[in-house]
């Protein structure tokens, strides 16, 4: 089924407003261990081993090696495990560098008056469905959200910004993460064994009188990620709303759905003449859910003014490069 057809016939997904970080925990990032002094077989040593395993998610053999190396000190053992995983991740990332990453996920996160879209890529759709890859997307979304919320500009109108791959890499990881996002990326590569990339992010922040509508298509549900929404397409639509509107969330979702399905290049004007299926201005385009009217004709009686939008399609840059 085509994207347009599926958008017209399937219900619109609801999005959440907040998310909590879930730390990316590699399960078994390295395999060869050298012999070392053995741990005591006492009950306390076994308890330490179990606790370290639960806390970090690493294998028993690696947790045992960490405790032996660090003389049974739990905090030092945890730090040692993360350091070893980091080394393995960077080593594997260097080996896999250059392999194409045309799969992946779009992540949408909204909190109060702020919304972010991020794109993280991998080599295969199979890995994109792995919860550890999805936790990486969450870390990127949370890091972008923190970056946006730390901006202290006093808003009289909306604010919109973009981050490229190198800018994303330098951001701090989410609240429960360690180091930068590029460190989290290396851990994920070491764990899952595929090349990955932090492709891009967009953020929108609005004052009173504005609203950010959103939509993600091809949504994937993952309870551990709470209100982060994942999919293959995503859109943010910035609307001005001078009055209180009861169905504003529904209108915002429908506008986001239209942006995903019709891929406009600009907003246009309510005065623009309709241009049919080839129209690239948003407002004079045929409305996705009712092509007998334009989007502008749908929006006008709703009491909102569309002022801007952002649209992400997973892997679109890679697809264009391959076509060329």
UniProtKB/Swiss-Prot annotation:
Residues 1-44 form a transit peptide. The modification Phosphoserine is found at residue 269. GO terms for molecular function: translation elongation factor activity. One of its GO terms (cellular component) is mitochondrion. It is found in: Mitochondrion. This is Elongation factor Ts, mitochondrial. Keywords: Elongation factor, Mitochondrion, Phosphoprotein, Protein biosynthesis, Transit peptide. The lineage of its organism: Eukaryota, Metazoa, Chordata, Craniata, Vertebrata. The modification N6-succinyllysine is found at residues 75, 132. GO terms for biological process: mitochondrial translational elongation; regulation of mitochondrial translation. InterPro entries: EF-Ts_dimer_sf, Transl_elong_EFTs/EF1B, Transl_elong_EFTs/EF1B_dimer, Transl_elong_Ts_CS, UBA-like_sf. Belongs to the EF-Ts family. The gene is Tsfm. Its main location: mitochondrion. HAMAP family: EF_Ts. CDD domains: UBA_EF-Ts. Associates with the EF-Tu.GDP complex and induces the exchange of GDP to GTP. It remains bound to the aminoacyl-tRNA.EF-Tu.GTP complex up to the GTP hydrolysis stage on the ribosome. It comes from Rattus norvegicus.
